[in-house]
Amino acid sequence: LPSDLSPYSAIVIFGGPMSVNDDEQFIKDEISWMKQVIESNIPFLGICLGAQILAKYLGCDVVKNKNDLAEIGFYEIEPVGEGGNIFKNQNIFYQFHTEGFEIPPNCQLLARGDAFKNQAFKFQNCYALQFHPEVNFLVHLRWLFLVLKKKPTILFLKGSQNLFYQLYLRFKYNKAISLWLDSFLDNYLLAQK
């Protein structure tokens, strides 16, 4: 992890197959690194695991759904507060997780959902998204291929969408999500500099 953040316009931590609760040194290092990121005042975007790392750093738990649900597929989020402006043109996003975060104190909830109540929040100039707006059609296919190869029953988890329905929704929402991400980066994340 870089110790000098001055060359960066923004910092993004993406998702991954690991859990923020795993006892791996690199996860602990990323959680600790958040102190430097926040103090640098550089805009930050946490996506899925990245959002959970921010929440964990801010003192909140990241836990499995109490009804043992997963979100693997496309799900609607409900904008809250400032999220009404952020998500006014797009509120269905691709998700791939079995854990969710609590909203830390002094943070602003931006969106909530059904299975995982907290979907997005803001802390100072940091945005945390539980979902994956960065995943396009090819990345989506690659993820499904790699995950199904390792865990062939993952799409049978309660709450998950089947492969064909996910692909149908990918075709339906791919362009709108891509446009939303471009707008979000320009009008919210990078506008904070």
For each predicted feature, which ranges?
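Short glycine-/acidic-enriched loop or helix-start segments at secondary-structure transitions
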Residues: 22-24, 55-57, 105, 138-140
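Catalytic nucleophile loop
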Residues: 37-61
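A conserved active-site-flanking secondary-structure segment within enzyme catalytic domains
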Residues: 56-93
